[in-house]
A protein has these predicted regions:
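Short, small/polar residue-rich loop motifs at catalytic or cofactor-binding pockets
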Residues: 37, 105-108
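Glyoxalase I/VOC metalloenzyme domain signal
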Residues: 1-31, 37-99, 112-125
Length: 125
């Protein structure tokens, strides 16, 4: 059995570009709609499925204010502080920073961010 995360967003082309930039991901599979959005797009990092993205079938209501999500994507063992900082800068642009970059009780360098698509990320070294 396998499990993989998928997000549904308004603005799937922009979201794919942003996640590729934030995490060094590559598009490994894609199906576009007649409206030039993604019906389904799979991103890989180091040859492993990282995230799937699809255009939301209706206009998503994204509250960009400080809202606690009931689900988060935890991306850890990113290798360097520079990798974490890059992801933080990309994801926080237009999003909401919950916890700024720095140490916490269980990690030396991490942050919590809700990106401009309403997706909650915990990123860490």
């Amino acid at each position: 059995m396998k499990i993989s995360p998928q997000v549904y967003v308004t603005g799937s082309l922009e979201a794919v570009e942003m996640y590729c930039k934030a995490f060094g991901a590559e598009i490994s599979f894609q199906i576009k709609t007649e409206e030039n959005t993604y019906a389904h797009c799979e991103l890989t990092v180091n040859g492993q499925l990282f995230l799937a993205i699809s255009e939301a079938p209706f206009d998503c209501d994204h509250n960009k204010e400080h809202v606690w999500q009931n689900m988060a994507f935890n991306v850890y063992e990113m290798g360097t502080e520079e990798a974490v900082r890059n992801a933080y800068e990309v994801l926080s642009d237009g999003g909401t920073v919950i916890d700024t970059l720095g140490p916490c009780d269980w990690n030396a360098y991490c942050a919590n961010v809700i990106d401009k698509f309403g997706v909650f990320w915990w990123i860490a070294i």
